[in-house]
């Protein structure tokens, strides 16, 4: 049963939506308000020095893995080139309407009316379904701080940052730390008279490449930290794995590595919080070009800032790297928290006719592959090959998932869309029917090692199920080097077997008690 589907946005999630929904035989129209695809990466105003903090194998879709390339972190230009190749390879361009801004989306009976604007013309078109792929980065979030309205210096959000030379010779305060903030603060420190970084707490910051490893395959997102087996084991194993690394950090002779290690220790367990995957900031901190102030801002004055520790600094400019807030101006639906949605995709009362794609932030791994998995599920729902649970069941799942993720990431509860990449991907893959069948060590030992002990690449979900690419996926997975030594593999296999045995014994014990 084919559907007419409107996709709003031709960024990473929108491209995935067009591809997966057309694969399902649906008639797809994608509206993009900009003149090109790629979302934030296509924005000419975004600073040119931007490099992705997720490696190319996790930022690529599962049906077009760039295995002809070495593992690397793409620049903005390189990633746009990949997306362009993807669009051309799968003939996606004919579905995208550029310079078409969606103004209003309204439900009328069992249809959706989408009103869009192109140049000076406004039109309305009817669809069976709407997939919102507009992304997180729509409405900059500015903190409400005492005295900010009285401050007379320049105020800018990272969304508007373009050129470090605008801050040459100035005293600059940067507020907040994420991937872009690490880049922006580092750049400004090169030309500023003084650069201060204000943070409320010590954040967990990870390097793109794992320290003390010569193997270029050993990046933060292609380490055993993103393997299926590590994420099947209790958190005490995570702590044991990372403790040795932290100890190496804090005893390093390199000041920037040592400082990062000290921050990591003070930030708390990394598996319980959002992690900034950009270590660039620590070199200017070590060199004295960036002065961190941990604790937060008390107030602003006419030409100064006062921190909660009592320190007062005169400043000429402020750059807020404080993220974005959800914004859907074309919808009359209010969503305060994506965790209120089933799988962070569906408003239960509206069914699958309205979906939100790509509004999940994985602690590790990339948003594009999560968006792709969501769209594979959406395509099955649209075709009638799958059905959403009942209303009460969806609300039960929402309640359970919300509690689970809030407990999992209790240190950074403000990052309300944060999930464990491995667990979330598996949960949706089960709904799609594309969970990989993991063989025993005796049947297919090499594939088992790649599926359990190597990174949980999206290609794993192309081995089985609908729209599988068994040969291509298997070839890629087997070609990737083992990231764990055989002693570590055996150790984890024994630990997993012991965990399964204990679970079985507990279950048997409960059955005996209930008799």
From Swiss-Prot:
| Purpose | Brominase involved in the biosynthesis of polybrominated aromatic organic compounds. Catalyzes the bromination of 4-hydroxybenzoate (4-HBA) to 3-bromo-4-hydroxybenzoate, followed by bromination and decarboxylation of 3-bromo-4-hydroxybenzoate to 2,4-dibromophenol. Can also use 3,4-dihydroxybenzoate, with lower efficiency, forming 3-bromo-4,5-dihydroxybenzoate and 3,5-dibromobenzene-1,2-diol. Can utilize iodide in vivo leading to the formation of iodophenols, but cannot use chloride.
What's its EC?
1.14.19.55
Gene disruption: observed consequences: Deletion of the gene abolishes the production of bromophenol-containing species.
Q: What is this protein called?
A: 4-hydroxybenzoate brominase (decarboxylating)
What does the record say about activity regulation? Activity is abolished in the absence of either bromide or NADPH, while a partial reduction in activity is observed upon omission of FAD. Activity does not require the addition of a flavin reductase to regenerate FADH(2) in situ.
Taxonomic classification: Bacteria, Pseudomonadati, Pseudomonadota, Gammaproteobacteria, Alteromonadales
Protein's gene: bmp5
Instruction: Work out whether the entry's keyword set contains NADP.
Output: yes
Q: Which reaction does it catalyse?
A: 2 bromide + 4-hydroxybenzoate + 2 NADPH + 2 O2 + 5 H(+) = 2,4-dibromophenol + CO2 + 2 NADP(+) + 4 H2O; bromide + 4-hydroxybenzoate + NADPH + O2 + 2 H(+) = 3-bromo-4-hydroxybenzoate + NADP(+) + 2 H2O; 3-bromo-4-hydroxybenzoate + bromide + NADPH + O2 + 3 H(+) = 2,4-dibromophenol + CO2 + NADP(+) + 2 H2O; 3,4-dihydroxybenzoate + 2 bromide + 2 NADPH + 2 O2 + 5 H(+) = 3,5-dibromobenzene-1,2-diol + CO2 + 2 NADP(+) + 4 H2O
Tell me which Pfam families the record gives: FMO-like
- Specify the species: Pseudoalteromonas luteoviolacea (strain 2ta16)
Identify the domain of life: Bacteria
UniProt entry tagged with the keyword Transport:
no
């Amino acid at each position: 049963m084919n559907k007419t589907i409107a996709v709003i946005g031709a960024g990473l999630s929108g491209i995935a939506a067009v591809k997966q929904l057309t694969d399902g035989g649906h008639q797809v129209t994608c509206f993009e308000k900009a003149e090109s695809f790629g979302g934030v990466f296509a924005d000419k105003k975004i600073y040119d020095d931007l490099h992705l903090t997720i490696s190319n194998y996790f930022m690529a879709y599962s049906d077009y893995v760039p295995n002809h390339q070495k593992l690397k972190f793409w620049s903005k230009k390189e990633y746009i080139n990949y997306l362009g190749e993807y669009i051309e390879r799968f003939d996606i361009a004919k579905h995208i309407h550029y310079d078409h801004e969606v103004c209003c989306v309204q439900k009328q009976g069992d249809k959706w009316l989408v009103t869009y604007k192109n140049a000076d013309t406004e039109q309305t078109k009817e669809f069976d379904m709407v997939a919102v792929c507009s992304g997180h980065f729509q409405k900059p979030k500015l903190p409400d701080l005492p005295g900010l309205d009285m401050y007379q210096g320049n105020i800018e959000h990272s969304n508007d940052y373009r050129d470090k030379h605008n801050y040459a010779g100035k005293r600059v305060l940067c507020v907040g730390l994420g991937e872009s903030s690490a880049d922006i603060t580092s750049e400004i420190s090169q030309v500023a008279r003084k650069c201060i970084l204000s943070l409320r707490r010590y954040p967990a910051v990870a390097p793109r490449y794992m320290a003390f490893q010569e193997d270029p395959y050993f990046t933060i997102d292609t380490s055993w930290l993103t393997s299926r087996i590590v994420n099947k084991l209790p958190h005490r194993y995570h702590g044991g794995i990372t403790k040795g690394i932290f100890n190496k950090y804090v005893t390093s002779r390199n000041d920037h590595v040592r400082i990062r290690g000290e921050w990591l220790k003070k930030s708390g367990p990394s598996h319980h919080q959002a992690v900034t995957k950009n270590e660039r900031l620590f070199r200017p901190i070590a060199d004295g070009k960036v002065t961190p102030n941990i604790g937060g801002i008390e107030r602003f004055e006419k030409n100064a800032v006062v921190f909660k520790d009592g320190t007062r600094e005169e400043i000429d400019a402020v750059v807020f790297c404080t993220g974005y807030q959800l914004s859907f101006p074309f919808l009359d639906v209010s969503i305060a928290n994506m965790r209120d949605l089933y799988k962070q995709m569906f408003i239960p009362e509206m069914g699958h006719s309205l979906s939100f794609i790509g509004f999940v932030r994985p602690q590790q791994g990339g948003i594009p592959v999560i968006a792709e998995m969501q769209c594979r599920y959406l395509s099955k729902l649209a075709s009638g090959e799958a059905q959403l649970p009942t209303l009460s069941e969806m609300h039960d799942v929402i309640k359970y998932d919300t509690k689970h993720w809030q407990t999992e990431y209790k240190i950074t509860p403000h990052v309300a869309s944060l999930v464990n990449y491995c667990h979330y991907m598996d949960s949706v893959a089960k709904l799609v029917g594309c969970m990989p069948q993991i063989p025993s060590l005796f049947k297919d030992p090499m594939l088992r090692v790649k599926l359990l002990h190597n990174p949980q690449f999206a290609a794993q979900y192309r081995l089985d199920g609908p729209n599988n690419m068994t040969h291509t996926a298997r070839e890629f997975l087997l070609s990737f080097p083992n990231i764990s030594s055989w002693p570590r593999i055996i150790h984890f296999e024994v630990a997993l077997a012991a965990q399964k045995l204990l679970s079985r014994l507990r279950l048997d014990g409960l059955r005996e008690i209930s008799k």
